[in-house]
């Protein structure tokens, strides 16, 4: 019935696209008129549109004219005309949806339409790409259109100064990566003055490769952290013990499907014996699982995970004495990202490299919650349909499949499945040889660096024969995390006849594989060669070189087309169908022919874990011989079903994690907004007074509860708190003994006495100086309390799952306890602020401006772990005289400032100085 209805009425996607065709016709109708305009008249349209917006005209009413202006500018500046289907893609983006456009259909050019239209409002438009190279390329390329039309553009890449970032964000359109935008948001909430902030709000954003960023990285929080104490030697000790333990596989259980590993009962007993014999357990404890040894249990578990779950050259590589994570989805190195909870340190100990200190979180946000800050969110990709439900559920974004400008001529062959890895590799080598010899370019996709380099070794020594001639080795290029610097160049040449390119998953995404070669990259290489020879090419030289290259590339393209176009060969199926579709989508661009095929074996991870035994039994039943493959539609369907199950499981994990992070996100927004108000204010005295009165209200509620009799009051306890927090010695007992005296009278007298004392303290210095003291102190205090709160939430999140064993919903438990912790944060902020401002000795010296702490670590965690990181900034060993003089108030008793940061705090709290009073300075 559904198919019958679709036949007559079309799919919902077709109806959406058709509905936009009327506006496309209107845009086309304006083309002759705008083509006749001079450059100045066309540029003047921008100011005309802004003036109409200022008069109250809605933005949507400008869409037809604005899109027509951008199309004309594209023709004049870049020699590129937006196709009708690109106009449809631009409308979807303007509406806050996702445009699914196939590779080669010009997503980068499409983005110029909605960016121009939305930038007219003057609130800033952000365009997100997956790496710095693409951000710079797109900004310099498409920025020419925006500049021509009178709009400014900027680009945010790693290594920019604060001033450069501010200028880029103040541009009409800003390009950059999701990491850079996210970290700038977090840094803006660590600074101490509005002038230091770089971003100016979150108005409209377009995310390129939206599936990669909003789905694949959805479990990867952006974290700014600082180092804690050094436990590197202990990590090494535990690693040695665990390496010995796992030699006997009865000591642990490894669940590959869930990616988990735990000690068996035998393993627990064995490691306990070893630790006890080595004197590693706390004294006078019953065993490993005694509360005093819980941190040791944590170290053992992380060492176990590092040695069993994480594989060298697949999950990470070692480079320059560092463990660098590998992105499972792209195969790229994730430089700067570190796994949390000591797991990264455990891997460092495993590999024998320097063990870096653990980190404590100063600020964090998930990719999901960062992008949900924007009033309007849009995205582009070649593969989003398989995740349409998730985009709708989490981001409220619809996916629209945009028709191709030309028909797709790609042929997708059925998978070939072999019994063993060796048989599969033999067939892959034969297929590569055939393509190379016939002049057909081939892109080979692998799932890991290890697999790409193994295949490279096989190709280097492969003996083959073609037309009676014998050869050894096949020339090829390898594109993985080790060679990411050459990424764009390798991908650009992947379409020349006979080229063999091995790439991990979707490395090189964002750069088209053009049959015959990439003109822009060839020209860039030529310019570089000329520069090396000391020659500065003239415009005429460039035109002549371009003409020469057009002939050369045209001839090469004809040979590649005659051989069948680009052949895409997948060496394994990914857990996600979308990643497989991304690989397939590299061929068949702009109506070119192409072919794709996956070569699989029963030993591949996906098939082995989810369908290995059944598949092997079927192959035996059918009598499949050595080197033979089975190819059938039902087999493709069975693999797709296994992938759907894994996708659904991963989606549930992401959705569940988001529910937990939403709890933190609400609190984060509240704290960041409050902090922003503090920073922008010039006078916080009313807030300080309100805090003081709230503290007194808390005292009254605790020590003189409502409806309690006078003999039930705890006046002694109240007196202690008043002296400790307010610095006041008052005759509370005499007051309480007065006839008719109650809680309201106590509140009034305490408020009056505290206000008078605060006024006396303020008289020691000028009102302006006091406002400066209050503001600087309050900002530092809110940061300190928020950091401690994040640490408590981390600990809560790590143990809350155990509540499920007690038949209680862990999420509801987490919400309840997180709210209680947040209330405690607010209470502590009021109390600590009041105590310090009422009790410290005021000795004012003109303070240096407060700046964001230096030496912070920016971390974006591995998508597979989805774990949180622990956090905090390092303080120096005591404070220098200059630092002491710069303190707005003497917040420490005399001599305490010389305490070593890792030493015990002199206050007797039992905490380290850096985690107690030292954190205040």
UniProtKB/Swiss-Prot annotation:
Its main location: membrane. Keywords: ATP-binding, Cell inner membrane, Cell membrane, Cytoplasm, Membrane, Metal-binding, Nucleotide-binding, Protein transport, Translocase, Translocation, Transport, Zinc. It is found in: Cell inner membrane; Cytoplasm. It catalyses: ATP + H2O + cellular proteinSide 1 = ADP + phosphate + cellular proteinSide 2. It is a peripheral membrane protein. The keyword Lipoprotein does not apply. One of its GO terms (biological process) is protein transport by the Sec complex. It is an enzyme of class 7 (translocase). Part of the Sec protein translocase complex. Interacts with the SecYEG preprotein conducting channel. Has a central role in coupling the hydrolysis of ATP to the transfer of proteins into and across the cell membrane, serving both as a receptor for the preprotein-SecB complex and as an ATP-driven molecular motor driving the stepwise translocation of polypeptide chains across the membrane. Belongs to the SecA family. This is Protein translocase subunit SecA. It comes from Caulobacter sp. (strain K31). The gene is secA.
């Amino acid at each position: 019935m559904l198919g019958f209805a679709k036949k007559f009425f079309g799919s919902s996607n077709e109806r959406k696209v058709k509905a936009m065709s009327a506006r496309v016709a209107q845009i086309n109708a304006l083309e002759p008129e705008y083509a006749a305009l001079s450059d100045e008249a066309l540029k003047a349209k921008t100011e005309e549109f802004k003036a109409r917006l200022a008069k109250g005209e809605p933005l949507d009413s400008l869409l037809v004219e604005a899109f027509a202006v951008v199309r004309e500018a594209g023709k004049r500046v870049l020699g590129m005309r937006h196709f009708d289907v690109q106009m449809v893609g631009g409308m979807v983006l303007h509406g806050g949806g996702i445009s699914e456009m196939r590779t080669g259909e010009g997503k980068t050019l499409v983005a110029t339409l909605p960016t121009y239209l939305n930038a007219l409002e003057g609130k800033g438009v952000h365009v997100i790409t997956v790496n710095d190279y693409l951000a710079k390329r797109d900004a310099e390329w498409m920025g020419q259109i925006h500049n021509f039309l009178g709009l400014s553009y900027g680009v945010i890449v790693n290594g920019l100064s604060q001033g450069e970032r501010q200028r880029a964000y103040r541009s009409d359109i800003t390009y950059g990566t999701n990491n850079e935008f996210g970290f700038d948001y977090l840094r803006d909430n660590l600074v101490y003055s509005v002038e230091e902030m770089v971003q100016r709000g979150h108005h409209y954003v377009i995310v390129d490769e939206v599936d990669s960023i909003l789905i694949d990285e959805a479990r990867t929080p952006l974290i700014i952290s600082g180092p804690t104490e050094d436990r590197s030697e202990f990590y090494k000790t535990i690693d040695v013990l665990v390496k010995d333990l796992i030699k006997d596989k009865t000591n642990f259980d490894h669940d590959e499907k869930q990616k988990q590993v735990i000690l068996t009962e035998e393993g627990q007993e064995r490691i306990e014996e070893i630790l006890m014999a080595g004197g590693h357990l706390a004294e006078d404890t019953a065993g490993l699982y005694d509360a005093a040894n819980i941190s040791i249990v944590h170290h053992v578990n992380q060492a176990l995970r590092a040695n069993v779950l994480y594989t060298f050259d697949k999950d990470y590589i070692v480079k320059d004495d560092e463990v660098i994570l590998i992105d499972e989805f792209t195969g790229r190195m994730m430089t700067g990202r570190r796994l949390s909870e000591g797991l990264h340190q455990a891997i460092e100990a495993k590999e024998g490299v320097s063990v870096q200190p653990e980190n404590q979180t100063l600020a964090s946000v998930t990719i999901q919650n960062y992008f949900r800050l924007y009033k309007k969110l849009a995205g582009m990709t070649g593969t989003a349909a398989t995740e349409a439900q998730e985009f709708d559920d989490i981001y409220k974004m619809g996916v629209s499949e945009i028709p191709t400008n030309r028909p797709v001529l790609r042929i997708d062959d059925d998978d070939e499945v072999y019994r063993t890895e060796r048989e599969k590799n033999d067939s892959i080598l034969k297929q590569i040889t055939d393509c190379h010899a016939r002049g057909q370019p081939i892109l080979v996709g692998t799932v890991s660096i290890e697999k790409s380099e193994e295949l490279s070794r096989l190709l280097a020594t492969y003996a083959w024969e073609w037309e009676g001639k014998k050869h050894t080795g096949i020339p090829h290029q390898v594109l993985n995390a080790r060679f990411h610097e050459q990424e764009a160049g390798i991908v650009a040449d992947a379409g020349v006849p006979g080229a063999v390119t091995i790439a991990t998953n979707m490395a090189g995404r964002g750069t088209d594989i053009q049959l015959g070669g990439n003109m822009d990259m060839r020209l860039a290489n030529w310019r570089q060669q000329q520069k090396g020879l000391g020659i500065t090419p003239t415009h005429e030289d460039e035109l002549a070189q371009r003409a020469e290259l057009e002939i050369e590339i045209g001839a090469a393209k004809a040979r590649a087309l005659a051989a069948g176009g680009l052949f895409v060969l997948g060496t394994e199926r990914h857990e996600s169908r979308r990643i497989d579709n991304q690989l397939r989508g590299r061929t068949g661009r702009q109506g070119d022919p192409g072919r794709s095929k996956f070569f699989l074996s029963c030993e591949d991870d996906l098939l082995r874990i989810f369908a290995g035994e059944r598949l092997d039994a079927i192959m035996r039943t059918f009598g499949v011989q050595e080197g033979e493959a089975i190819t059938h539609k039902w087999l493709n369907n069975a693999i797709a079903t296994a992938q759907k199950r894994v996708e659904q499981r991963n989606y549930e994990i992401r959705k569940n994690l988001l529910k937990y992070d939403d709890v933190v996100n609400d609190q984060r927004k509240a704290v960041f907004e409050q902090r922003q108000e503090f920073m922008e204010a010039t006078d916080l005295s009313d807030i300080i007074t309100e805090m003081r009165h709230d503290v007194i209200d808390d005292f009254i509620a605790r020590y003189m509860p409502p409806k309690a009799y006078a003999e039930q009051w705890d006046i002694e306890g109240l007196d202690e708190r008043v002296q400790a927090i307010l610095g006041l010695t008052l005759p509370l007992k005499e007051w309480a003994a007065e006839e008719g005296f109650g809680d309201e009278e106590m509140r009034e007298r305490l408020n009056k006495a505290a206000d008078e004392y605060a006024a006396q303290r303020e008289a020691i210095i000028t009102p302006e100086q006091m406002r400066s003291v209050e503001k600087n102190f309050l900002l530092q205090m809110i940061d300190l309390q928020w950091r401690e709160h994040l640490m408590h939430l981390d600990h809560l999140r790590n143990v809350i799952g155990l509540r499920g064993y007690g038949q209680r919903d862990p999420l509801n438990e987490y919400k309840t306890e997180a709210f209680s912790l947040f209330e405690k944060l607010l209470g502590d902020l009021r109390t600590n602020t009041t105590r310090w401002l009422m009790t410290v000795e005021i000795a004012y010296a003109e303070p240096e401006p407060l700046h964001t702490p230096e030496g912070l670590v920016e971390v974006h965690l591995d998508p597979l772990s989805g774990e949180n990181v622990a956090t905090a900034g390092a303080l120096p060993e005591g404070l220098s005289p200059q630092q002491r003089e710069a303190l707005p108030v003497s917040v420490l008793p005399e001599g305490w400032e010389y305490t070593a940061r890792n030493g015990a705090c002199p206050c007797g709290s039992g905490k380290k100085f850096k985690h107690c009073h030292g954190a205040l300075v």
